[in-house]
């Protein structure tokens, strides 16, 4: 994958995250600033999602750990655990905020 393909895929991911948060009605604020997408919750905790263009990865920072995701077969997959990004993100949102956001189609 080249840089422009990576940026397009990451932008699509960010757009899906924002759309699904809106559709869910969850009390989750989000702000995109360049390659950084921040999700903030009522309890003032945050999840930080960041595009790492040189590595063609999307990174997710939670209260507990950092996760690195590679695009593989149409999904973003954690390079250590094998977890799928949107499934993990949904669980991380619930764990930090008790809000439910369903990222499935």
From Swiss-Prot:
Tell me a Gene Ontology molecular-function term this record carries.
ferrous iron binding
Q: Which SMART domains match?
A: Frataxin_Cyay
GO BP term (any one): iron-sulfur cluster assembly
Q: Which SUPFAM superfamilies match?
A: Frataxin/Nqo15-like
Q: Which CDD domains match?
A: Frataxin
Keyword list (alphabetical) reads: Iron, Metal-binding
Protein's job: Involved in iron-sulfur (Fe-S) cluster assembly. May act as a regulator of Fe-S biogenesis.
Q: What name does this protein carry?
A: Iron-sulfur cluster assembly protein CyaY
Q: Which organism is it from?
A: Psychromonas ingrahamii (strain DSM 17664 / CCUG 51855 / 37)
């Amino acid at each position: 994958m080249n840089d422009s393909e990576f940026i397009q895929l990451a932008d699509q991911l960010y757009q899906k995250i924002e759309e699904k948060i809106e559709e869910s009605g969850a009390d989750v604020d989000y702000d995109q600033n360049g390659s950084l997408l921040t999700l903030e919750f009522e309890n003032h905790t945050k999840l930080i999602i960041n595009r790492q263009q040189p590595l063609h990865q999307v990174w997710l920072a939670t209260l507990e750990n950092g996760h690195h995701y590679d695009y593989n077969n149409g999904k973003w997959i954690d390079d250590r655990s094998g977890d799928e990004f949107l499934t993990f993100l949904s669980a991380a949102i619930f764990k930090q905020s008790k809000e439910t956001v369903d990222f499935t189609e």
